[in-house]
C-alpha cells in the first residue's frame, strides 16, 4: 500500500583541473590566487527511506531517513608534488585536511621537569614530539590530524499533521569530522 519508499544512489566522480584558491607569497600583493591545483576522486552512497507511519483523515505522521557516505581524496597535485603544506593539500587525503601539531593533553604538575625540556610548564598544552628529537618544531613534528569531511551524515525528519497544523522534527548528525574555528586559528 505504498507506505515505504526510498532510493539508493551510488556514485564515483573524478575531477581534473581542479580550480581552487591557492595561497600565494605576500610579495605578490595578494593572499590568494585561482589555480588548477590537481585531480580529485569522490565516491559514495546516498540512501533515502520515506515512510508513512500513520495516515488518517485529520492526522498523519511521515518519516524521512537519509544516510550519506562520501569518500573524497586528492589523487594528484599540480607539478607532480605529493603535498602542498601551505594550502593543506596531500595526495591520498581530503581537500579539507587539517595538518598541524598533535595536542596530546595538558602538562601536569608532576611532569614539570619533562615539560621544561620542551620549554613548557604545567598547565600548558602538551604537543607530541613526533620524531622524538626532544624538540617541538613545525618542520618535523606536524602531522595530518584529520579532515573536515565527515565519515558519514544522517538525517531523520518526522512530520506530524493535525488538521491545518504541521509539526516537523528534524535531526541531523555528522560523524567523524574535524571542525576548524577561525577565531582560534
Which functions belong to the PLM regions below?
Residues 1-27, 35, 42:
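Extended, folded domain segments that form the structural surfaces/walls around functional sites
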Residues 1-12, 45-53, 61-69, 154-160, ...:
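Membrane-embedded beta-strands that build the outer-membrane beta-barrel scaffold
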Residues 16, 22-29, 78-87, 184-185:
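Flexible, surface-exposed loop regions and adjacent strand-edge segments
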Residues 37-43, 95, 146-151:
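Short sequence motifs at beta-strands and strand-loop junctions characteristic
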Residues 167-185:
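C-terminal beta-barrel architecture of Gram-negative outer-membrane proteins
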Amino acid at each position: 500500500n505504498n507506505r515505504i519508499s526510498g532510493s539508493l544512489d551510488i556514485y564515483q566522480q573524478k575531477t581534473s583541473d581542479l580550480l581552487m584558491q591557492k595561497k600565494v607569497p605576500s610579495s605578490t600583493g595578494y593572499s590568494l590566487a585561482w589555480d588548477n591545483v590537481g585531480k580529485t576522486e569522490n565516491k559514495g552512497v546516498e540512501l533515502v527511506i520515506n515512510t508513512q507511519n500513520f495516515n488518517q483523515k485529520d492526522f498523519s505522521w511521515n518519516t524521512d531517513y537519509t544516510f550519506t557516505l562520501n569518500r573524497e581524496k586528492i589523487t594528484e597535485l599540480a607539478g607532480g608534488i605529493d603535498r602542498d603544506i601551505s594550502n593543506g593539500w596531500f595526495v591520498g587525503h581530503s581537500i579539507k585536511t587539517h595538518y598541524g601539531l598533535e595536542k596530546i593533553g595538558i602538562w601536569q604538575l608532576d611532569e614539570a621537569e619533562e615539560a621544561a625540556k620542551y620549554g613548557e610548564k604545567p598547565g600548558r598544552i602538551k604537543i607530541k614530539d613526533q620524531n622524538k628529537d626532544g624538540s617541538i618544531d613545525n618542520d618535523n613534528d606536524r602531522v595530518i590530524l584529520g579532515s573536515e569531511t565527515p565519515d558519514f551524515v544522517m538525517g531523520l525528519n518526522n512530520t506530524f499533521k493535525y488538521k491545518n497544523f504541521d509539526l516537523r522534527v528534524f535531526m541531523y548528525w555528522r560523524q567523524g569530522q574535524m571542525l576548524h574555528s577561525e577565531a582560534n586559528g
